[in-house]
Swiss-Prot record:
CDD domains: ABC_6TM_MsbA_like. This is ATP-dependent lipid A-core flippase. Residues 345-581 form the ABC transporter domain. The keyword Transit peptide does not apply. It comes from Mannheimia succiniciproducens (strain KCTC 0769BP / MBEL55E). It is an enzyme of class 7 (translocase). Residues 30-313 form the ABC transmembrane type-1 domain. SUPFAM superfamilies: ABC transporter transmembrane region, P-loop containing nucleoside triphosphate hydrolases. The gene is msbA. Homodimer. Involved in lipopolysaccharide (LPS) biosynthesis. Translocates lipid A-core from the inner to the outer leaflet of the inner membrane. Transmembrane domains (TMD) form a pore in the inner membrane and the ATP-binding domain (NBD) is responsible for energy generation.
Length: 585
């Protein structure tokens, strides 16, 4: 059982882990980088042309050179436009591929996580990881990369132009460069921490909104609008405060860089007045090129400072995704597979405790369910009935003892094979936003014919409400069957189990959502379904399990009574008390 933890990796470590995801698309990166570098060179090239333009073109009134310059400007601008398109397209392609790959990888990983993981982590927070955090990765692999490569190449090319023109005036850059680098490194650490806080806040915001949307009827019924509004406002305000901290850090770093750069400009102007430098044939064109280059550096320096926050958001998002991907999926070490089991189920001294709980949910439980028999579990809420059903299918792994299926430990089966032998119909039915037919034949629609699906629906008395629908079995039922009643949804779940035809059937209060008339009809179908199968029934309504071969009364994780319906009534114990409560009011 795992709860999502936060690790603290450096930016380089995080990017090193992200690189294998980017590497398959590196051809796009290379093309984009080449285009960005060429784009930067055209900009710095235009500045470099100022020297001959001023010294030769205007200084010497060379009209032929001025005509050549006119052509060169057009060529440079054309190259700039082409390279801008290539870089934008290639980086959009790479970032889209990276985000898609990360989302697919995360989605697949979550599907194989144990049930205990979802007990410990909110759905809203996980949805935020799949949507918001994975999208943030695009910012680090595209927008930030555009700025880093292009502006970095631009600064380097401008520096080369300055040194080639007058290294004496350019030396001031080697003094301010390390100062700016230290500043950016300091701001990076601050942004990284603030970005992680922002991602956590987004998860909380999504979880809060999802909680209200899913429980909307409860909110309306109990007049909880003000409570939910207050809860959402608090989370929203917390996210706003954290966002403002990032803005403050960004706003402070930007003017500091600008001030340092302006000092460099002032230094260049001052150095130009020194006779020893003026005597080095410093022409008007040379000075204009150096000064213009330093002015031109202000924009890329500002961009590089600002992109740091964006890049750190992306790296922080990567880390939150890796936090999930580093968690272990369900333990599936079994090698045994059976084409079809008989269905003998045995619990041998089984004990189980939920993570974070002091008291065990089950204590030294032992019983055998022979093939073809129906065993029912009854007891008060929280006594451990549903836990027993979850252990058979290995949604949780036991702490002590063993559970056998046909004499083979369930731990020795592969998970997929074990679960093909078990059909579960629970109280909480989940249907998908798909057609009725696809929901009945979920995950195996190519395995069953249309006739088999119809037969299962008829056996579950579902065709009674399906046939009047305009599209019948091809009706799309909405998210979680929103267009159906509780009883109709339950009957589709029973039809799904009927179609699967597994030798072990687990009914976890399967008729709890049905009205009395529907329950009678379904009960007849369930009795037919239970023939030649091992059936474990968790029942709230005792009337549904009177014909069970044996009834186990569970109390505080232990079997306190067992026997047939008549035998347990004769004992005049816990079962008799439950029976009186239901039938005698």
């Amino acid at each position: 059982m795992q709860k999502l933890q936060e690790n603290d990796l450096s930016t380089s470590q995080t990017f090193k882990r992200l690189w294998p995801t980017i590497a398959p698309f590196k051809i796009g990166l290379i093309a984009a980088a080449a285009a960005l570098v060429l784009n930067a060179l055209t900009d710095s090239g235009l500045i470099y042309l100022l020297k001959p333009l001023l010294d030769d073109g205007f200084g010497k009134a060379d009209t032929s050179f001025l005509k050549l310059m006119a052509v060169l400007v057009i060529v440079f601008i054309f190259i700039r436009g082409i390279t801008s398109f290539i870089s934008s397209y290639c980086l959009a392609w790479v970032s889209g591929k990276v985000v898609m790959t990360m989302r697919r990888r995360l989605f697949k990983h979550l599907m194989y996580m144990p049930v205990s993981f979802f007990d410990q982590n909110s759905t809203g927070r996980l949805l935020s990881r799949i949507t918001y955090d994975s999208e943030q990765v695009a910012n680090s692999s595209s927008n930030a990369l555009v700025t880093i490569v292009r502006e970095g190449a631009y600064i380097i090319s401008l520096l080369a132009v300055m040194i080639a023109t007058s290294w004496q005036l350019s030396v001031v850059l080697f003094i301010i460069g390390p100062v700016i680098a230290v500043l950016i490194r300091l701001v990076s650490k601050i942004f990284r921490r603030l970005s992680k806080n922002m991602q956590n806040s987004m998860g909380e915001l999504t979880a809060t909104a999802e909680q209200m949307l899913k429980g909307h009827k409860v909110v309306l019924s109990f007049g909880g609008q003000q409570i939910e509004e207050q809860r959402f406002n608090e989370v929203s305000n917390d996210m706003r405060r954290k966002g403002m901290k990032m803005v403050v850090a960004d706003a402070i770093s930007d003017p500091i860089v600008q001030i340092i750069a302006s000092l460099a400009l002032s230094a260049v102007l001052y150095l130009a007045t020194i006779p020893s430098i003026m005597s080095q044939n410093l022409s008007a064109g040379s000075f204009t090129v150096v000064f213009s280059s330093m002015l031109a550096m202000l924009r890329p320096l500002k961009s590089l400072t600002n992109v740091n926050s964006q890049f750190q958001r992306g790296m922080a998002a990567c880390q939150t995704l890796f936090d999930i991907l580093d968690l272990d999926t369900e333990k599936d070490k079994g090698k045994y597979e059976a084409e079809r089991v008989k269905g003998d189920v045995s619990f041998k001294d089984v004990s189980f405790t939920y993570q974070g709980k002091d008291q065990p949910a089950l204590k030294h439980l032992s019983f055998d369910i022979p093939h073809g028999k129906t065993f029912a579990l009854v007891g008060r809420s929280g006594s451990g009935k549903s836990t027993i059903a979850n252990l058979v299918t290995r949604f949780y792994d036991i702490n002590q003892g063993e559970i056998l299926l046909d004499g083979v430990n369930v731990q020795d089966y592969t998970l997929s094979n074990l679960r093909t032998h078990c059909s579960v119909v629970s109280q909480q039915v989940h249907l998908f936003n798909d057609t009725i037919a696809n929901n009945i034949a979920y995950a195996a629609k190519d395995k069953y014919s249309r006739e088999q699906i119809i037969a299962a629906a008829k056996a579950a008395h579902a065709m009674e409400f399906i046939e009047p629908l305009e599209n019948g079995l091809d009706t799309v039922i909405g998210e979680n069957g929103a267009s159906l009643s509780g009883g109709q949804r339950q009957r589709l779940a029973i039809a799904r189990a009927l179609l699967r035809d597994s030798p072990v059937l687990i009914l976890d209060e399967a008729t709890s959502a049905l009205d009395t008339e529907s329950e009678r009809a379904i009960q007849a179908a369930l009795e037919e379904l239970q023939k030649d199968r091992t059936v474990l029934v968790i029942a709230h309504r005792l009337s549904t399990i009177e014909k069970a071969d044996e009834i186990l009364v569970i109390d505080h994780g232990e079997i306190c009574e067992r026997g047939s319906h008549e035998e347990l009534l004769a004992l005049n114990g816990a079962y008799k008390q439950l029976h009186k409560m239901q039938f005698n009011g």
